């Protein structure tokens, strides 16, 4: 099956091809035709199976660029997720040559800038329910033209923390709007509430989802190695992998961390086999807390019970992120991925997260 057989227009298929997406996933193949037909739907599928595109493709089809008004509203339970969705929607529209705007409306951001952005009449609004309510109350956001409502991670949006806010937003929308609800883990209570509100049809794809958390920590580029040292003091890292890329040299990072008193070893890519074995033995036996490696040197690596993966350099693409992250949280065990980013790298990380459909959280302060 391909996207053409699903009725996805050529300009959107070409936009997907630019991103290296050639064939639909199982959830996309089941969800897209039903969404195109105007059904109210629940889509439940594991993380990383393409749920964002499962609803964004029908959204893009429904948008009329000639209409200067908000036509689709996407609600998300966290600011980070809203920003990620807005990023991937904006990229998809641009790649497809669609002259439409996408605007994120979240609390904590400058509301005056959001009001200015709304004057450009974006077609797609992605945001948090409280900020959407606030801007509507101020008369800055008109919702009368909304044809499609999306609740991403609807199990959280229809939970106790967000339900009242979401219900308030729903009452502001036209009665004939279509509703699409997505989640990786839709529990019975959330599905029951969704059925009560929207009477949707459930489309479920089985499979295992990632069990690791994905964090980011903003730190100036020059202080990244120092940040790794601080994380080893602050977090219960028993066995961590630190990945370097173009900006950092593994040997240099090793020297700096050892100078700070961290028990670290490294795979340098050019060491002898016995040196590589010694480094791996040290991390496996618990004599070292951190293993520093490049992506190339880590190929084929098998280390059990890695509890943290740290990106000193961001991965170049989705495949590399998943390859690195897959070193932790194996066999259902807990784990976390921490990306150390300076302000300039944050947008790149958010774009990666959006493509993978993972939620980023800022690493809590100590």
Language model: regions and residue ranges:
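Conserved helicase RecA-like core
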Residues: 2-366
């Amino acid at each position: 099956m391909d996207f053409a057989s699903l009725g996805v227009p050529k300009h959107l298929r070409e936009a997907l091809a630019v991103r290296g997406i050639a064939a639909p996933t199982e959830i996309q193949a089941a969800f897209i035709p039903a969404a195109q037909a105007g059904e109210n739907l629940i889509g439940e599928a594991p993380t990383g199976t393409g749920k964002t595109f499962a609803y964004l493709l029908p959204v893009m089809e429904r948008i009329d660029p000639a209409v200067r008004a908000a036509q689709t509203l996407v609600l998300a339970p966290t600011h980070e997720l809203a920003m990620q969705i807005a990023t991937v929607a904006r990229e998809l529209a641009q790649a497809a040559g669609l002259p439409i705007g996408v605007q994120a409306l979240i609390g904590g951001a400058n509301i005056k800038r959001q009001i200015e952005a709304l004057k450009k009449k974006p077609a797609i609004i992605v945001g948090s329910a409280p900020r959407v309510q606030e801007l509507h109350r101020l008369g800055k956001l008109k919702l009368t033209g909304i044809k499609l409502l999306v609740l991403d991670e609807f199990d959280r949006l229809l939970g106790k923390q967000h339900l009242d806010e979401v219900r308030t937003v729903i009452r502001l929308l036209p009665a004939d709007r279509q509703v699409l609800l997505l989640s990786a883990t839709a529990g019975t209570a959330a599905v029951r509430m969704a059925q009560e509100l929207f009477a949707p049809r459930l489309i479920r794809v089985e499979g295992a989802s990632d069990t690791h958390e994905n964090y980011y920590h903003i730190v100036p580029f020059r202080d990244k190695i120092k940040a790794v040292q601080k994380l080893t003091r602050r977090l219960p890292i028993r066995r961590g992998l630190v990945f370097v890329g173009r900006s950092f040299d593994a040997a240099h990072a090793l020297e700096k961390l050892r100078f700070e008193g961290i028990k670290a070893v490294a795979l340098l890519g050019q060491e002898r086999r016995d040196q590589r074995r010694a480094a791996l033995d040290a991390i496996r036996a618990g004599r070292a807390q951190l293993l520093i490696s490049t992506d190339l040197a880590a190929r084929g690596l098998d280390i059990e019970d890695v509890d943290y993966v740290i990106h000193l350099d961001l991965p170049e693409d989705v495949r590399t992120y998943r390859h690195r992250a897959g070193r932790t949280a194996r066999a259902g065990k807990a784990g976390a991925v921490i990306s150390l980013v300076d302000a300039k790298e944050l947008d790149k990380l958010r774009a990666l997260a959006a493509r993978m459909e993972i939620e980023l959280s800022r690493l809590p302060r100590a």
